[in-house]
Amino acid sequence: RVPFGSEFLYDISSDKDSFYVSWSENSQIAELDSELDTIRTIDVRLERTPVSEDELADIEEEFSDHHPNQLRSVMDLLPDRKVSYEEMMVDHQNRIWLKLTRWHENDQEWLILSEEGEPEKRVLLPKEGMLTHISEHHLGFRKDDHIFALFEAVE
């Protein structure tokens, strides 16, 4: 996977009657029914920005430490402008959670869109780790192979 490159993202609606798909490069999310017909398209109004020096340094450090043979190839494939978001999840209220590619030293930033696609909130989680699930009571977060946390969502 090339950092900040285009990704095919998808998740299922909470009622399991439709699913959401996105090609992160075009900043649109389509909701499809079980027949693969488009129910609607949501425009995500986020700008693509250049990869910063700090982000380049993070990429170089990560690949030098863990994948030194791939560093040169990855650096050659980096896009000039990064995609706006790199992960997508749909919660129990059919709100769309997008993990933004904005650089933060210690956090990862998630934008929550309403069911209609309007920005509602931003959530900051620890930079190292991954959001595993969203329920009406908590956010599941996996820091590494040994540490799993539940964060309480505060409205």
Sequence positions of predicted segments:
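Eukaryotic scaffold repeat domains enriched in small/polar residues
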Residues: 1-155
